[in-house]
Amino acid sequence: NNINYLAAILVISFAGNVVFSQSQYPSNLLAQKGNFSAGAARALGQPFQGVATSDGIIPGLFPIKSTGVSTAPIREAADRFLATLSTADLSRVHFAINDPEWRDWSNVDVGIFPRRGISLEEMNEAQKDSAWELLAAALSAEGLEQTQNIMKTEQTLFEINGEPIRYGTEKYYFTMMGIPSSDSPWGFQLDGHHLVINYFVLGDQVVMTPAFWGGEPVYADSGMYEGNHILQNEQDAGLQLMQSLDAAQKRAATVDPEKVRNNQVAAANQDNLILDYEGIKGAELTSQQKLNLLNVIRSFVGALRNPHAEVTMDEIGQHIDDTYFSWVGESADDSVFYYRIHSPVILIEF
């Protein structure tokens, strides 16, 4: 039901339509497309439980309660966006609040994993404007800028690789779940390459998870968006925390001293991931190191609009002693690394 869904999702921590026929796909891309579709189908075939440790879901972590922070600006922006859509557009965009579309997202490009909904690429100017107004109402200024910069990396990828089937700054799709309301659950999803936002609203509570913020290259040294960069604050905050640990703490935090593979585990199709804690526990950190840890978390949570971000940070802070920080790789200024932050109420991977 809707109440259980809220609790579960919180645990996880314009021109014309551009359509490409199967004949336009290279054979290797078609094979990848098939593999991703099959993986998504398998995941959606399993009942949703949520991310948990091997001890199971902890009940009662996320009560439905008033935060005292109005969601009216988000709701009104969503209404304005929906009002710009035609009947045909609405049939593609609108889903029931409990539709599996919530789970049917991916961080890979649209050439490999087709999306539902309507893309920025297909919208007219009025629709684009209202879509961006919705994002501006839902996100902080920093979150909005990061969203825009991630989309710009797609232009850089196109300049490097070509392949208009796969890459483009407007190949990002909007869907709406439920009907914007002051008291009933609703939300929206933005889904595309390296950028996924699932945004759930109930009364004055907001949950923005699961979310994926990524991109390549992280810095564009040429092209239309030369100088564009992404995820530097998240990178620097994590490294600063690791470098603040003493030798014994670093040993406790380090899962593997060598970064030789993709260590991400909570990607698409991992709604029911069983993941036990690793690394150093928050209770083993000094007061300053705990503040550093919260600063890393804030670099992600801060993409959410304020004061909703502060509400989320307060929830996270209540579990800081039970929050684990783990590291893969070395910790010099120029090292390649991965880190994870994992607590009863949030899971972050970088």
Label each residue range with its predicted role.
Residues 1-7:
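Bacterial N-terminal signal peptides that target proteins for export
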Residues 17-21:
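Sec/Tat signal peptide C-region and signal peptidase I cleavage site
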Residues 22-87, 91-350:
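A cross-kingdom marker for long, charged
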Residues 7-16:
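Bacterial N-terminal signal peptides
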